[in-house]
Amino acid sequence: ISSYWKRVKQGCRAACMRAYDAGRTSVELQPWYALNAGGEAMNKPFENLTVLDLSRYLLGAYPSLYLADFGARVIKVEDTKVGDYCRQEEPQIDGESYYHYALNRNKESVSFNLKDPEVLDAFYKLVISADVIIENYRPGVAKRLGIDYETLSAINPRIIYCSLSAYGQNDPRSLSALHDVNIVTQTGYYDLTQGALALLSPADFAAAMVAIQSILTALIQRGMTNRGAHLDVAMYDSLVWWNAMLDSRWFFFGKDFPSSKREYPSIGYN
């Protein structure tokens, strides 16, 4: 087992260096989790899927990255003015953001002004042959642009449309511009870190993982019904679900426990 993980680590490092030397996203990376027990590359289960990624930042980019790593054709639809905001993130190498390339490897990119009727028609043509759409606009924005689920499912009834937001599509709180730190605070996640700022983005990652699971479930369902679905993924709900084991303490005991108390001695090494 140790030799297997050593090969995995070496392979990941080599792949990342090849990506950097060859212009990063122009090269195809083999993710470590796509290796079988013998260290050989697995077949790509999503190579017949087309994904349109309308999202910005980690929240939507991570689910489409997962699909891309396993063979899906992911077309990232970016704004004509600034593109994905990830492109501006620091630190950068030669004017290129590491954050952008870490999240958007193995993806194609197109710049669309979806407010232009002619461009919108071109986008609709992509929808006809697409399988999955991912977006993280604030509720109502997609409808104003004419790219909401109702509109696009009329073009392609098999489309799986994943909407990511802070509290869900029907909660008015999602109309505000909220970020990971807001959700982490409101769900009580900072109790785990005793108020220290999380090094990663727990709410973003939690919602991204729920989105991946929801998309995979919808693909299985579509195989049985030949119909798509609208997936409503909320960051708040996802992080609460992620913390289910810890949050349940309140319901069972009516109190919290000191952060130093290990409730599960058998996993005390974590």
Residue ranges with predicted function:
Residues 43, 170, 176, 180, ...:
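Acidic, glycine-rich segments within the central catalytic cores of soluble metabolic enzymes
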Residues 46-48:
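Phosphate-coordination loops involved in phosphoryl transfer and adenosine-cofactor binding
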Residues 52, 98-154:
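A structured beta-alpha segment of the ubiquitous adenosine-cofactor-binding alpha/beta core
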Residues 60-61:
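N-terminal Rossmann-fold NAD(P) dinucleotide-binding loop
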Residues 69-106:
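Glycine-rich phosphate-binding loop and adjoining beta1-alpha1-beta2 segment
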Residues 116, 135-191, 205:
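N-terminal Rossmann-like NAD(P) cofactor-binding subdomain of oxidoreductases
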